[in-house]
Amino acid sequence: MIASIERATRAGGRFGAHRLTFIAVAALVAAACGTEDAADPLEPNGPAGRIRFVNLITDPTRNPVNAILEGVPFGVGLGYTQSTPATLPAPSTANYSAVLAGDRTIVLKRTADTTVTVGTLNISVAANNDYTVFATGGTGGSAVTAFLTGDVNTPVPTGQVRIRVVNMSPAAGTVDVFITAPNADLATATPAATALAIRTIFPGVTVAPGSYQVRTVPAGTPPAGRAAAVNTSFTTPAAIAAGGSRTIVLADAPAGGAPPRSFQLTDQ
């Protein structure tokens, strides 16, 4: 299968476009997804938005999954907390993929048996907007559904980086968020966000380039008790360069519940 997808990139607040041609990559993913060759319906010849998909399905028996966006392979073998298109092989790797504006569908198939549909996610995409599509649910055989966040990816101020947080962890509950230098004393730290509820986005802070540790504690934890109460902690694996943007996601354990964890998505 040879599929051409028009990818949109932001420039000065507008979408520019450049064409990426998938040859071996598309053929490999199509075979893994068990799909038929078909004309690519995702070439944005009209108004387009951008999306990325994140697997937060808390049912190990249904993971990993293949994601099929509007009939076109979008990701294969996506384990818990993995995302696409970030995990696609080069040259298809990207932070987001372009898709025509309007109502769209992502079908999730079990990688080990692509005759099994894990979930069908219906989303609505507005032109010139970025979205993260989280596949959620699955614990105890429950249904898999979509939770959509609108991602504001305006240019980061010169010489700064942006760090935002999304709470997708029922086990973590409502939290206070601390964004500090690694191993900084939480007793004297000022929270970047307080009372961040489940399925809520903290739009972020802009800080100097460097490495950061993002920690959460149950909302209202007194300063002296914060270090012992940390329920998620993520340290950026490398220093974030100027102009970069990251989203830290709080999530439950792979089968649901505790212990919660956190991981990083690259925005810019």
Question: Which sequence ranges carry the predicted segments?
Answer:
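Sec-dependent bacterial lipoprotein signal peptides
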Residues: 1-32
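Intrinsically disordered, low-complexity polar regions and short flexible loop motifs
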Residues: 33-268
